Regions:
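C-terminal helicase lobe
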Residues: 2-4, 8-244
């Protein structure tokens, strides 16, 4: 995780593997930084396939619902509210009703409406579900004040960050130098340890050590447990079509 105060709180993490590309260089730097905090040698591996960017694009769509979807969600509340201006419907109900493809975007739309003080969320007694209350039910959907420019700018920044992460993966210069310059450090030195700096050495082939072989077997065992048997063979539940 790239969240502060969460994840593995150990200083002796020796190995960090990214099975898919993170959404930004900032996220990658924070996540990879979990390794070797005790100052000893540690290794970070990023398994990259451009097709994996679709996962991050899905997340970007989920946190950037757009003004049109926000208005659709608000109109749903106007249509469904009871005499107390309350709606006792789940996020899945809302998603199905307005024809949204990304359920995450419904939650993001609710967040925007709450920050604008158009709605509030409340606990439903005797249930773990939450309801929604209209705070200004007299306001029609067409009269909602939504900063569309700010929404568009945030989505643009999110997509730009993903593109920068892709550029890092394709870069033919020192990875550490690239990252440091991304964060504004000028004339950053090369690390001498990344795959680019190692050059031809990184392409040499050799038999794995016993310890490396054990790691590979454990890794493949985990992949197998995330698969299921079908009529035509084994099919991955997660990471389908990925190169590992």
């Amino acid at each position: 995780t790239n969240a502060f105060g969460m994840g593995i709180d150990r200083s002796d993490v020796r190995f960090v593997v990214h099975f898919e590309i993170p959404g930004s260089v900032e996220a990658y730097y924070q996540e990879a930084g979990r390794a070797g905090r005790d100052g000893e040698a540690a290794f970070c591996e990023l398994l990259f396939n451009y097709a994996d960017t679709r996962t991050q694009e899905f997340f970007i769509d989920g946190v950037n619902p757009g003004a049109s979807m926000i208005r659709d969600v608000y109109q749903f509340f106007l249509n469904d509210a009871d005499e107390n201006y309350e709606v006792h419907r789940t996020l899945d109900d809302i998603k199905e009703s307005i024809g949204a493809k990304n359920g995450m975007a419904i939650g993001a739309a609710l967040g925007t409406l709450m920050r604008g003080q158009w709605i509030e969320r409340f606990d439903i007694p005797g249930s773990r579900a939450k309801g929604t209350r209209l705070l200004r039910p007299e306001v029609l959907t067409r009269d909602l004040t939504i900063d569309e420019a700010a929404l568009e700018e945030k989505e643009r920044r999110d997509r730009e960050k993903l593109e920068k992460m892709v550029q890092l993966c394709y870069a033919n210069t020192c990875r550490q130098q690239w990252i440091l310059e991304y964060f504004g450090e000028e004339n950053a030195p090369i690390c001498g340890s990344c795959d680019v700096c190692r050059g031809e050495e990184s392409s040499e082939r050799r038999a794995p050590t016993d310890e490396e072989g054990l790691i590979v077997r454990k890794f493949l065992s985990g992949v197998a447990r995330m698969s299921r048997r079908t009529a035509t063979g084994w099919e991955g539940i997660f990471g389908r079509g990925r190169i590992i």
